[in-house]
C-alpha cells in the first residue's frame, strides 16, 4: 500500500508551499473534492524511487468551534489515515494557542509526528524554534519552504528513514517480483527459466467513483453473481477490502474502497467516501473501473479522479451507471457530453450499464481483461523499432535549426503502463504534436486498448559539447598558409 504523509497546521504556515516542493510542481492539485474534504489537496511525491501520497490539509485555527470540530470537518480524516504527520508551525509568528491545541490532539493520536518550523529564512533557526519545544513533540526541523532551504534535510533525515523503516513491513508483491525479474532479463542478466507470467497473476480491479454513483451496487452485483465469500486479506489497512473472485476461469482481486459495512453504520458522506482509500486503491490496482452517474453527468470530482488515474498510468474502463429508465433523447445528450468532456480519453472502453438490474454488467470483464493484457504484453525491440521506422516513413520528424531530427531505434522501457523508449538525435526538440503522433501510431500498431501508453525519448551525449575546439599543429600550419594567401590576394 502506498504510504501517506499529511501536512497539518494553522492557516498560512506554509503547508501548500511545502506540498508543492514535495510534489515538485507549482500546481500539484491532483484531486480536489470541494464540499466533501474542504481545502484538501492530494498529490503524488517520490523520494529516491519510493512513492507516497502527500496531503495538504486545510488550516486549523482553533476558533470557538473547537479544534476537534474543525479537524473533523477538514483534517481529522487525513490525520487518521496518514502514516506520518508533518506538523508545521510559523517560526516568525512564534508559538500560538492553536499550535498547542493541535499538538495536544496529535499527541493523543500516537501517530508518528514530526515538528517542522517554517519561515526561518533571515532568522537564527536555533533561536526561532526554542518556544516550540514546549509542544513536547521532540526534535524540530527548521525550513524555509518558499526558498527550499532545509527541505532536502527534512527529506533525508525524516521522510526517507521513515519510509525505509516502513518498507520491511510490506508484503512482497508477486507483481513487483515478476517485473523485477523481467527487467533483469532485459538488462542482459542471467536468464532463468520463466515460469512466471502476467496471466498467472490475478487481475487487481478497483471500482472507484463519487459517492452515490452505484459503486456498492455494482460490487454487490458482481459478487452476487459469483457467490464469493468476502474476507479481509492479511496485511491490508484502512478498511480497504480485497475480495478474491473468479470469472470465466480468470482470477481477480476486487478492491472495495468503501469497505463491507452495514448501511446503518455509515453515518455521513465523509465516512462513506474516503479519498485516501480511493487513491491508494488506484495505485494498487492493475485496472481501474471509473463509475459515472448517467443522471448527474460528469462532474469536476469525476475529472479529478480521472486525472489521478491517468497520472498513475493505470488501465481504465469507464462505466456509465443508472442507464436504465432514461429516454432516448437523454441518452443521446449524455453521450454527447461524454464525447465533449472525455474526448481526450481515446483509449478506454465506455460501458453503459444498470448495476441495479444487472444489464451490461457481464460485458465489463471483457474490457478489463483486454486492458490488462494490453498493459502487460511483452513487445520486442525489433518490433518496436520497425513500428518507429514505419511512423517516420509515413510522417518525417520536423527540422530543428535546419537539421532533421533523427530517430534511431526503440525498445520497451516498462509495462503497466507500456513504456516505449526511443533513442535518437535532437529528440528533446521534438514538438508535442509529433510526440502525440508517435504515441497514437504505436497505440494503433500494437492494438493497445484500455491502457495508456507512454513514450520516453533519450539521446546520446555529445562528447564535444561545451568543449573548446583546439587545433592540431598540422591544422595550425595549414591555417597560417591560408592566412598568408588571403593577405597576398588583397
Swiss-Prot record:
<comment type="function">
    <text>GTPase that plays an essential role in the late steps of ribosome biogenesis.</text>
</comment>
<dbReference type="Pfam" id="PF01926">
    <property type="entry name" value="MMR_HSR1"/>
</dbReference>
<dbReference type="GO" id="GO:0043022">
    <property type="term" value="F:ribosome binding"/>
</dbReference>
<feature type="domain" description="EngA-type G 2">
    <location>
        <begin position="203"/>
        <end position="376"/>
    </location>
</feature>
<dbReference type="InterPro" id="IPR027417">
    <property type="entry name" value="P-loop_NTPase"/>
</dbReference>
<dbReference type="InterPro" id="IPR032859">
    <property type="entry name" value="KH_dom-like"/>
</dbReference>
<protein>
    <recommendedName>
        <fullName>GTPase Der</fullName>
    </recommendedName>
</protein>
<dbReference type="InterPro" id="IPR006073">
    <property type="entry name" value="GTP-bd"/>
</dbReference>
<dbReference type="GO" id="GO:0005525">
    <property type="term" value="F:GTP binding"/>
</dbReference>
<feature type="binding site">
    <location>
        <begin position="256"/>
        <end position="260"/>
    </location>
    <ligand>
        <name>GTP 2</name>
    </ligand>
</feature>
<keyword id="KW-0677">Repeat</keyword>
<comment type="subunit">
    <text>Associates with the 50S ribosomal subunit.</text>
</comment>
<keyword id="KW-0690">Ribosome biogenesis</keyword>
<keyword id="KW-0547">Nucleotide-binding</keyword>
<dbReference type="InterPro" id="IPR005225">
    <property type="entry name" value="Small_GTP-bd"/>
</dbReference>
<feature type="binding site">
    <location>
        <begin position="209"/>
        <end position="216"/>
    </location>
    <ligand>
        <name>GTP 2</name>
    </ligand>
</feature>
<feature type="domain" description="KH-like">
    <location>
        <begin position="377"/>
        <end position="461"/>
    </location>
</feature>
<dbReference type="InterPro" id="IPR016484">
    <property type="entry name" value="GTPase_Der"/>
</dbReference>
<feature type="binding site">
    <location>
        <begin position="321"/>
        <end position="324"/>
    </location>
    <ligand>
        <name>GTP 2</name>
    </ligand>
</feature>
<feature type="binding site">
    <location>
        <begin position="9"/>
        <end position="16"/>
    </location>
    <ligand>
        <name>GTP 1</name>
    </ligand>
</feature>
<feature type="binding site">
    <location>
        <begin position="118"/>
        <end position="121"/>
    </location>
    <ligand>
        <name>GTP 1</name>
    </ligand>
</feature>
<dbReference type="InterPro" id="IPR015946">
    <property type="entry name" value="KH_dom-like_a/b"/>
</dbReference>
<dbReference type="Pfam" id="PF14714">
    <property type="entry name" value="KH_dom-like"/>
</dbReference>
<feature type="domain" description="EngA-type G 1">
    <location>
        <begin position="3"/>
        <end position="166"/>
    </location>
</feature>
<dbReference type="GO" id="GO:0042254">
    <property type="term" value="P:ribosome biogenesis"/>
</dbReference>
<dbReference type="InterPro" id="IPR031166">
    <property type="entry name" value="G_ENGA"/>
</dbReference>
<keyword id="KW-0342">GTP-binding</keyword>
<comment type="similarity">
    <text>Belongs to the TRAFAC class TrmE-Era-EngA-EngB-Septin-like GTPase superfamily. EngA (Der) GTPase family.</text>
</comment>
<feature type="binding site">
    <location>
        <begin position="56"/>
        <end position="60"/>
    </location>
    <ligand>
        <name>GTP 1</name>
    </ligand>
</feature>
Amino acid at each position: 500500500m502506498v504510504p501517506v504523509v499529511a501536512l497539518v497546521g494553522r492557516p498560512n504556515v506554509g503547508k501548500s508551499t511545502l506540498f508543492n516542493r514535495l510534489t515538485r510542481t507549482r500546481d500539484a492539485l491532483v484531486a480536489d473534492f470541494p464540499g466533501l474534504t474542504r481545502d484538501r489537496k492530494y498529490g503524488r511525491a517520490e523520494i529516491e524511487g519510493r512513492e507516497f501520497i502527500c496531503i495538504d490539509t486545510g488550516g486549523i485555527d482553533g476558533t470557538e468551534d473547537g479544534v476537534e470540530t474543525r479537524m473533523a470537518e477538514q483534517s481529522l480524516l487525513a490525520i487518521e489515515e496518514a502514516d506520518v504527520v508533518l506538523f508545521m508551525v510559523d517560526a516568525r509568528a512564534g508559538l500560538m494557542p492553536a499550535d498547542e491545541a493541535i499538538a495536544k490532539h496529535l499527541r493523543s493520536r500516537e501517530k508518528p509526528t514530526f515538528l517542522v518550523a517554517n519561515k526561518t529564512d533571515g532568522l537564527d533557526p536555533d533561536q526561532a524554534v526554542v518556544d516550540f519545544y514546549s509542544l513536547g513533540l521532540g526534535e524540530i526541523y527548521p525550513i524555509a519552504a518558499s526558498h527550499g532551504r532545509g527541505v532536502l534535510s527534512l527529506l533525508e533525515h525524516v521522510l526517507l528513514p521513515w519510509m525505509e523503516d516502513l518498507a520491511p513491513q510490506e508484503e512482497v508483491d508477486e507483481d513487483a517480483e515478476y517485473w523485477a525479474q523481467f527487467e533483469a532479463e532485459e538488462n542482459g542478466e542471467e536468464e532463468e527459466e520463466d515460469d512466471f507470467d502476467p496471466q498467472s497473476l490475478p487481475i487487481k480491479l478497483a471500482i472507484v467513483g463519487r459517492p452515490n454513483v452505484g459503486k456498492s451496487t455494482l460490487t454487490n452485483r458482481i459478487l452476487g453473481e459469483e457467490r464469493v465469500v468476502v474476507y479481509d486479506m492479511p496485511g491490508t489497512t484502512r478498511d480497504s477490502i480485497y475480495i478474491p473472485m473468479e470469472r470465466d476461469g480468470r482470477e481477480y482481486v476486487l478492491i472495495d474502497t468503501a469497505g463491507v459495512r452495514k448501511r446503518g453504520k455509515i453515518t455521513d458522506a465523509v465516512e462513506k467516501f474516503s479519498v485516501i482509500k480511493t487513491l491508494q486503491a488506484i495505485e494498487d490496482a492493475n485496472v481501474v473501473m471509473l463509475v459515472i452517474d448517467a443522471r448527474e453527468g460528469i462532474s469536476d470530482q469525476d475529472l479529478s479522479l480521472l486525472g489521478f488515474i491517468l497520472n498513475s498510468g493505470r488501465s481504465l474502463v469507464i462505466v456509465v451507471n443508472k442507464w436504465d429508465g432514461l429516454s432516448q433523447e437523454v441518452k443521446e445528450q449524455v453521450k454527447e457530453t461524454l464525447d465533449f468532456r472525455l474526448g481526450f480519453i481515446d483509449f478506454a472502453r465506455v460501458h453503459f450499464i444498470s448495476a441495479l438490474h444487472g444489464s451490461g454488467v457481464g460485458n465489463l470483464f471483457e474490457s478489463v481483461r483486454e486492458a490488462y493484457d494490453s498493459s502487460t504484453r511483452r513487445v520486442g525491440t525489433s518490433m518496436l523499432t520497425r513500428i518507429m521506422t514505419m511512423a517516420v516513413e509515413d510522417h518525417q520528424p520536423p527540422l530543428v535549426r535546419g537539421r532533421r531530427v533523427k530517430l534511431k531505434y526503440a525498445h520497451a522501457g516498462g509495462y503497466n503502463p507500456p513504456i516505449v523508449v526511443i533513442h535518437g538525435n535532437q529528440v528533446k526538440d521534438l514538438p508535442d504534436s509529433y510526440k502525440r503522433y508517435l504515441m497514437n501510431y504505436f497505440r494503433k500498431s500494437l492494438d493497445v486498448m484500455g491502457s495508456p501508453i507512454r513514450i520516453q525519448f533519450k539521446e546520446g551525449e555529445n562528447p564535444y559539447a561545451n568543449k573548446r575546439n583546439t587545433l592540431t599543429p598540422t591544422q595550425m600550419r595549414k591555417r597560417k598558409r591560408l592566412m598568408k594567401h588571403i593577405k597576398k590576394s588583397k
